[in-house]
Structures are given as C-alpha cells and as structure tokens.
Amino acid sequence: MRTLLTILAAGSLLAHITEDTSDLLQHVKFQSSNFENILTWDGRPESPPDTVYSVQYKTYGEEEWLEKEGCQRITQKSCNLTMETSNLTELYYARVTATDGAGRSATKMTNRFSSLQHTSIKPPDVTCIPKVRSIQMIVHPTYTPIRAQNGHQLTLENIFQDLLYHLKLRINHTYQMHLEGKQREFEFVGLTPDTEFLGTIMICIPNLFKESTPYMCRVKTLPDRTWTYSFSGAFLFSLGFLVAGLCYLSYRYITKPPPPPSSLNVQHILPFRPLQFIQEHTLIPVFDLSGSGGLAQPVQYSEVKVSNPTEPPGPPPRHSLPEIAYLGQPDLPVLRPSGGPPHQALPVLSYAPQAAPEGRPSSYAPQGALEAKPPSYTPQAVSETQLPSYTPRATPDNWPPSYGMCGEGSGRDSPPVTRSGPKHLGTKGQLQKEVPAGSCSPTGLSLQEVTPLAMEDPQEAKSSHQCLRVHTDSDSDSDTIGQREPGTRSSLKGQLPLLSSVQIEGHPGCLPLQTPSLPCSPTDKGPSPWGLLESLVCPSDEDPVSKTEAESPGLQAPDLESPTELDSLFRGLALTVQWES
C-alpha cells in the first residue's frame, strides 16, 4: 500500500514539471514565401528574458538531427533554413529547444515541410506607365533564393513552368478590363484621357492552385494635349509666315527705287500731244495706175491716237465715236495726171498738234446724198487769212462721185500698178513724174506722204512728190490748176480740224498745220471729201523746183485720153478713222 502511494506522488510531480516547461515554446512552424524558408516560434509572455533557443533540422527519413549554425542559444525567435531546405523534392523537419535561467527546458518539432507545396508567392514587381489613352504595365521577374547547379539564381518562371500573370483594371469600381498571359508587358488601350484607374496584378500557378498576393497600383491617364500641339503648330506656322511677309516687305521697301522727282515730269508742260501708234494695217492696191502690169507693193499705214497730256501715262480711254468707212461708188472718175519736175525727197519732219478753233466742228460726218443723185463735192476758193470751210451738197445725176489720192513719187520709176480696167490709160494715162509740188486736181485733194527716216532709202534724197488728180467726166476739160504765189507752201485743206500740227519722231522741228493757203483750184467751191487734216504744210515745198513751179502755174500735164476706173483699187478696203477729243 505504501509503495502505491509513492508511485502516484512521483507521477503527479513529473506531470506538473512537464506542464510548466511546455509554456516556454509555442507555434513552432515554417514560413516560406518565394522559396525563402524561415523557421519561427513563439514563447509565453511571462517567460524570463534570459531564455535562449537552439534549432535543429533533419531530412524526412533520417534519424540524426543536425544543428543549424548561427541558430544555437539565440534569443530571437526565428531562424532561416532556406539553404538547408533548398531541395524542392525533399521533405524536412525542424525542432526548437528553449532553456530558461532556472534550468528548465522545452523542445518542440515542426510538421513535415515541403517548400514546393507550402511556399507562398509574393506580389509581383510591376511598373505602371500611364499614357493619354492607354496604360502600360511591365512585370519584372521575381527571383528566388534557390540556385541552380551552376550557381545561377532561379526565378519563379524557372521554377513554375505554368506561371501566368493575371491583370485587372477598374474604373470607379464599375468597369473592369482583364488581361492574362505569360509575357511580362501588358497594355490597356482605349481608355479615357485624364482618368484615374485601379490596376491589380497577380501571379497564378494553376497546377498548384496558387495565387500571389495582388499588386495594386493607382494610375491616371494623361490629359489629351493634341489640340494644344495643333494650336502650337498653327501658331508657329502663322508666326513664321508673318515673319517671312515682314522680311519680304522690308526687302521690297529697301530695294524699291526712289520715285523720280516731280521736276522730271514734263507731261503737263508739253506743248503738243504725243502720237501713239496703236495698230498697223496694210493697204494692197488691186491694179497698177502707172500702166505696167502686176500687183502693187503693199503699203503699210499706222493708226494714230493722240494722248491727253494732262492725263497720267497709260492707254487713254476710247470714246464711243462713230467710225467712217469710205466705200467705192459704182461710177468711177477719170484720172488726169499732171506733169511736172519731180521734187526732192522730204526729210524726216517733226509735227506738233495745236489747238483747233472752238467754233469749228470736232468731228467729220459725211452727209448722205439723195437717192437719185450721188453726192459730189465742189471746192470753193478761200482767202489766205481764212481757214477753208466746205459744205457738201447734192449734184446732178450725171455727175459721178470722185476720188482723190495723193502719193509720194521719186525720180525713179514708180512701182508697177495694175490698170483699173479695159479702158486703161496709154502713155498719157500713166502718172507723170514731173508734177508740180502744189498741183492738185480741181475736185480732188493732194496729200504728200511723209516717210519716216527709218523707212527712207538714202538714195531717195532727191525724190519728189506726185499728186494724182482725179476729175469727173463733166469737169475734166473746164477745170484748171490753181495758181499759187511764190513762197507759199503746198497745203492740204479739209473740213475737220482734228490735227493742228503733226510731229514725227526723229525730226527736230514741228510742222504747223495752221497756216492757211490758197486752194488747190480756183474752182474750189465745196467741201473736200478728204478734209481730215486742216492743213498739212510740207517744208520741202520751198525748194527751188517748187518755187519755180509755183511761179509758173501754167505748166500742166496733158489731159488723159480716156477715163480710168478706180473702183477696183478701193474695192474690199475698209478705211477707219479713230480720234479722241
């Protein structure tokens, strides 16, 4: 009986001691993340501070415990067993022994541990890059403390072949976008600019049903500044264009020649109106009047326009003035040449227009004749001190209208001109070269042609002027050549005072047209049909030959034997006169 009581007392005492020492160690276990294996434990709160801890480990299937260097009699409550448990295919055990200052000790062992199964995955390392309409996420590789046989440090991708990255993007907790894959770069596109998003990235291991702790990032897309760039580009372009324009204007201002001084502007003080040649025509006579066959040489004339000196330079405006066309009549006049010595060629003359009398009409308008009677113009005699004045009047039916044509001859034979018809002139019908300077037909008009210096041959310096006289059939025997006094100049009288003087370029002087002269015939009692110029004074008429002939007006050429028709000469020609007031 006494022995039984002793055994019960010893067992109760041993149980009490064991219960007291078990409070020295609590929660001994492995904590592994990304294959980093840490052994941790806890002690009781009232344990004395002088308690020390020792760690031992062993592989599953072995009986001997191995001490961990650096984890013997330590006061901290953790020990890193990563290198000792680095084999992913092995199972491990570990135990901890705690000893206090009173000499009491306690030992606890962990459960069986497999790093491949029990390790946890940490959140990945991700960089979020915001853009205007997208967010780019780059996942960095996660390295583990496990090393390969060659010493290279392994990553999670090297250990888990089926590792995936799962990404989520949320907008105000209402809208989500998902991306998943093994690549390390992802981008969410089609986002709203200047908007905040919440991104979540996790590592998933489907075979082990493992997921990492999610990595969360808040990112805001960039504001859309495209319009700002466009506006800036447009502004810079406009600024460059403005600078270029200013540079161009400055260049034009610097290189612009200065305006000429007003003292050089002599347009308002010129005593004449310059003649401007604006159009050039060609007259081609149909038949030769000199008796030889063949077509005549073409004659060129220019249309002359007088510019207003008070107006600025430039083409003066055209007035709506009527155009006068001279057409041939069915009845033809008789051509009566006048003989006389040839004159010398006129030098290049210079003409200046002068003001015409205000009382005279400013335009010439031919008056229509009666239907039964064609018009005929009869010259009237005027005095030297009075300008000629003509009035057209009707003539009897048997008087055909006459044409007057004046040309310039020379000492040589004139160019061949075709005869006007079957009643052509013989030897007497040809134009005589010796025509007095002032001789004209009784009913016609003499116009001495002035040839420019550029068109005149130097060998024609002694050429003379010829006057073709045209008579009607009824007046061919009764009319005579007018007498002129010595010293008077041959003149061309007309009805319309359009030009008072004429100036030709290259001649030093002016040819006035105001000097009145005697009529071509004492029988001039009517207006002249060629009265466009008031008077055309030729200085060359004062040569000795002209003066001698002027003193002897009785010298006349014999009358033509037969009349010559000139209708074919002017057929198809439309002569137009234009003038400006």
Curated annotation (Swiss-Prot):
Segments in the Extracellular topological domain: 16-228
Assembly and binders: Heterodimer with IL10RB and with IL20RB. Interacts with FBXW12; the interaction promotes ubiquitination of IL22RA1.
Question: Which keywords, in A-to-Z order, does the entry hold?
Answer: Cell membrane, Disulfide bond, Glycoprotein, Membrane, Phosphoprotein, Receptor, Repeat, Signal, Transmembrane, Transmembrane helix, Ubl conjugation
Which InterPro entries does the record match to this protein? FN3_dom (IPR003961), FN3_sf (IPR036116), Ig-like_fold (IPR013783), Interferon/interleukin_rcp_dom (IPR015373), Type-II_Cytokine-TF_Rcpt (IPR050650)
Compartment(s): Cell membrane
Specify residue ranges for compositional bias: Polar residues: 378-389, 440-449
Family matches, as PANTHER family? INTERFERON/INTERLEUKIN RECEPTOR, INTERLEUKIN-22 RECEPTOR SUBUNIT ALPHA-1
Question: Which cysteines does the record link by disulfide bonds?
Answer: 71-79, 128-217
User: Per the similarity annotation, which family is this?
Assistant: Belongs to the type II cytokine receptor family.
Per the annotation, which location comes first and is thus the protein's main one? membrane
Transmembrane spans: 229-249
Protein source organism: Bos taurus
Stated name of the protein? Interleukin-22 receptor subunit alpha-1
PTM annotation: Ubiquitinated.
Summarize the protein's role: Component of the receptor for IL20, IL22 and IL24. Component of IL22 receptor formed by IL22RA1 and IL10RB enabling IL22 signaling via JAK/STAT pathways. IL22 also induces activation of MAPK1/MAPK3 and Akt kinases pathways. Component of one of the receptor for IL20 and IL24 formed by IL22RA1 and IL20RB also signaling through STATs activation. Mediates IL24 antiangiogenic activity as well as IL24 inhibitory effect on endothelial cell tube formation and differentiation.
- Give the CC-aspect GO terms: plasma membrane
Task: Using the UniProt annotation, give the residues that carry a glycan (glycosylation sites).
Answer: 80
What residue range is the signal peptide? 1-15
A molecular function GO annotation: cytokine receptor activity
Which residues are modified to Phosphoserine? 410, 414
A GO biological process this protein is involved in?
cytokine-mediated signaling pathway
- How is the protein disposed in the membrane? Single-pass type I membrane protein
